Amino acid sequence: MCGIVGYIGYQDVKEILLRGLEKLEYRGYDSAGIAVLNESGVHVFKEKGRIADLRRIVDPNVNATVGIGHTRWATHGAPSRVNAHPHQSASGRFTLVHNGVIENYEMVKRDYLADVAFQSDTDTEVIVQLVEKFVRDGLTTEEAFRKTLSLLKGSYAIAMIDAQDENTIYAAKNKSPLLVGLGDGFNVVASDAMAMLQVTNQFVELMDGELVIVTSENVTIQTLNGETVKRKPFTAELDASDIEKGTYPHYMLKEIDEQPFVIRRIIQKYQDDNGELAIDKAIINEVLNADRLYIVACGTSYHAGLVGKQLIESWAKIPVEVHIASEFSYNMPLLSEKPLFIFISQSGETADSRAVLVQTNKLGYKAITITNVPGSTLSREADYTLLLHAGPEIAVASTKAYTAQIAVLAILAAAAAKAKGFELDFDLTKELAIVANVMEMLCDAKEEMEKIASDYLTLTRNCFFIGRAVDYYVCLEGALKLKEISYIQAEGFAGGELKHGTIALIEDGTPVIALATQEHVNLSIRGNVKEVVARGANPCVISMRGLEGDGDRFIIPAVHPDLTPLVSVVPLQLIAYYAALHRGCDVDKPRNLAKSVTVE
């Protein structure tokens, strides 16, 4: 949930670190800091708040060519300057940044560091104080670093500098992402390649239980046992322009607008030599061999999984269960005889999902990861990967990854159906192309969406979304988008469930957004709208062309009924965006949230 960077080379390091941290703010932005090392010692700058707040306190007169940085999402200790990283050892010799959670930090603190006066409330400070203790006991820095790592339980990505050695960064990884970037006369470490695209596109992945000794000329990867590891670098297939806002005021709006292009790219990427949509035969064989599919995901990805379940069961006639990853880990259901797991994660680093994958791997079950990030932890540890090809998603609130996940699940469902002899009565390629065109039209309806947000949501404290069948799943996502960026208490409900309790919350003026895109439940959902209107609600009905009724606020051009979630979500994304904007909220970086949730 935090982001770390490090640089060692020949350039002044401050701006490289700050720009790198700006690219990692999606991982957390409670506080931030950098530490740079030169002949006069270590200079630490840290501040509560955003990278912009940190920039204001960095001394421009301090020059150095080695340094580390961190942007934080608090897990241990409140957001504050004291708890911000980097943390230093008691003497100030060692300075360290850390992403992850040290589960046994209290035990380590008690058993090894009882005589140390700690400066913060974080688990991270235990690491740097322990390194110094072992150096005082006579170990070299590398030996002390290695011994410290051997005592830690939990997740970590660490970068550390030694005030007595301007030529080295020490780094390590376990269950939290960390890459080493390679350059000519310099090397870097980072949680994400995006952070260091400014200086290199060549990276080496670290695996769990590995540490790395980084100098300006060499990178030495080792196991905790001291064995040297050789690993080929990869080229990050990102352009720096992909992670810039360009002319957009916010990343979220840019990413909403990118959705039509993402759908078209997915069509292109998943076409075989005959121009037909297809999935790798090995994956389809696994799907056919399974007696039940288990989709495991969190948040927006979980909502995409619910739509995927509908498509797979309807088209391929394969039973599917969808589970919240954080619950599955601690309450595994009774599994079928031949389960196949599908993990959905935009980042491929979601800790809750990875915890389930570790369990299922131990049990010997096959797994597929659907992710936007090739080479991510979930991608590496699953048997198969289906890529989203959505491009970098920077805004914390997911938009284009959600629709990409549904599109890929649709292609998987269609391929499995075809392999089982269930031919679809429509051309999925053509229908997805229509979806992309309709998405484009919806993205052009920003003024109408802004007006809806203004009319219904500017002053409200709560909002309800209602739908039936697959519309209900989209309502869950619409409510999540609204609550996470506008801070309006929003909930999505199945229309028929209102009368079983929720309708008690309806009062004069309560906004209720209803989706009506499914013909077989159209009359039912409109009956539910009448129920809330009778209790004083202020209804906003968004319907599909051909199913519209009198008074509907917005009508979506028609697409195939099974693919409506791909388009009906776009108005909800835009409504949430403008509601947040009107309320003065930080659209891209909502409070208390982080994009890549790498702690359980």
Curated annotation (Swiss-Prot):
A Pfam family it matches: GATase_6
Cell compartment(s), UniProt: Cytoplasm
UniProt domain Glutamine amidotransferase type-2: residue ranges: 2-217
Catalytic reactions of this protein: D-fructose 6-phosphate + L-glutamine = D-glucosamine 6-phosphate + L-glutamate
Gene3D superfamilies: Glucose-6-phosphate isomerase like protein, domain 1, Glutamine Phosphoribosylpyrophosphate, subunit 1, domain 1
EC number(s) recorded for this UniProt protein: 2.6.1.16
Entries under CDD domains matching the protein: GFAT (cd00714), SIS_GlmS_GlmD_1 (cd05008), SIS_GlmS_GlmD_2 (cd05009)
GO cellular component: cytosol
Active site: 2, 595
InterPro entries linked to this entry: GATase_2_dom, GFAT, GFAT_N, GlmS/AgaS_SIS, GlmS/FrlB_SIS, Ntn_hydrolases_N, SIS_dom, SIS_dom_sf
Domain SIS: 283-422, 452-590
GO MF annotation, one: glutamine-fructose-6-phosphate transaminase (isomerizing) activity
TM annotation in the entry: none
Keyword Cytoplasm in record: yes
Keyword Membrane: no
Entry coiled-coil feature ranges: none
Main localization of the protein described in the UniProt heading: cytoplasm
Summary of the function given for this chain in its UniProt record: Catalyzes the first step in hexosamine metabolism, converting fructose-6P into glucosamine-6P using glutamine as a nitrogen source.
Protein name as it appears in the record: Glutamine--fructose-6-phosphate aminotransferase [isomerizing]
Organism name: Geobacillus kaustophilus (strain HTA426)
Gene this chain is encoded by: glmS
